[in-house]
């Protein structure tokens, strides 16, 4: 596999900051927002958005962590480690993930959210949208659109877990 860095740490920071400004612009009542990071890297991105919202607007937006494994149609896991600090009923929930690909993880996250309560609205923020949807799901806030072939992979590294911020494109030797 060939590896190519397609987003560096500075570009990642800018993309998350831009997504935060878009969230501010599109939401009239920021006090009603709840961020829901999809484990694992989605939680880290959601925390960064939460920090930016605090810096820019002075708001403490609640942040939950969604475990989608028990809601997936391709993996059977009994334990659900979802943590949601507030009741999401009648709140505007913003799901946050690192990569949007087929849409299956997001479908599982929506199932999890509906299991927790009845939000007023659910929207989606992703750092990378790579295309290839299998379900009718689209992101409302996108850091980077990176079209890929189905044989390529996107890997998001985050300093919290990987000691570095970047996005890599992995491809078979003959594709890059």
UniProtKB/Swiss-Prot annotation:
Motif extent (PRPP-binding): 93-105
GO biological process terms on file: DNA-templated transcription termination
Single Gene Ontology MF annotation: RNA binding
Chemical reaction(s) catalysed: UMP + diphosphate = 5-phospho-alpha-D-ribose 1-diphosphate + uracil
The EC number(s) this enzyme carries: 2.4.2.9
Pfam families according to UniProt: Pribosyltran
Keyword Transferase assigned: yes
Domain of life from the UniProt record: Bacteria
Keywords tagged on the record: Glycosyltransferase, RNA-binding, Transcription, Transcription regulation, Transcription termination, Transferase
Assembly with partners or alone: Homodimer and homohexamer; in equilibrium.
General function of this protein: Regulates transcriptional attenuation of the pyrimidine nucleotide (pyr) operon by binding in a uridine-dependent manner to specific sites on pyr mRNA. This disrupts an antiterminator hairpin in the RNA and favors formation of a downstream transcription terminator, leading to a reduced expression of downstream genes.
Record-linked NCBIfam families: PRK05205.1-4, PRK05205.1-5
Family of the protein in this entry: Belongs to the purine/pyrimidine phosphoribosyltransferase family. PyrR subfamily.
Name of the protein in its database record: Bifunctional protein PyrR
Organism: Streptococcus mutans serotype c (strain ATCC 700610 / UA159)
